[in-house]
Amino acid sequence: MPPKPINWRMYSKMAVAGITCCVGGPALIYYISPTEEELFLKYNPELQKRSLENRVGKQEDFDNFVARLKEYSKSDRPIWVEAEEAARKNRSGKIEEQAKLMQEMQQRKEEIKKSGTKLMPGGSL
């Protein structure tokens, strides 16, 4: 029994359908998706104003984030390990700073008590 002939018509239909899905789908999404400018123009004026005010701050935050990622990537260790270590150092630094502030407040209170001045209820110390 001779081998079956190749069904070129079926394979060509499948190739056309595959190319249509692989190329046409992303092209359709690209065509339909609005640009940032179009979205911005659809905002109400209050949101546009707020967005313009916050734009510089968000850009600075993003630049700082990218700079930290570049710094983390210089190490041989994974980025998430470096980021976790930096966050831990940041937290411990804040805790130490809060402890120093509390100690200074206690010292001020003691100085006031020693000087004989009465603390007023609702006062700042």
Swiss-Prot record:
Residue ranges of the region described as Disordered: 103-125
Compartments, as annotated in UniProt: Mitochondrion inner membrane
Keywords: Chaperone, Coiled coil, Membrane, Mitochondrion, Mitochondrion inner membrane, Transmembrane, Transmembrane helix
Keyword match Protein biosynthesis: no
Coiled coil: 92-119
InterPro entries, sorted: Cbp4 (IPR012420)
Topology versus the membrane: Single-pass membrane protein
GO BP: any one term: mitochondrial respiratory chain complex III assembly
Function text: Essential for the assembly of ubiquinol-cytochrome c reductase. It has a direct effect on the correct occurrence of the Rieske protein, core 4, core 5 and apocytochrome b.
Designated name of the protein: Assembly factor cbp4
Species per Swiss-Prot/TrEMBL record: Sclerotinia sclerotiorum (strain ATCC 18683 / 1980 / Ss-1)
Lineage: Eukaryota, Fungi, Dikarya, Ascomycota, Pezizomycotina
Gene: cbp4
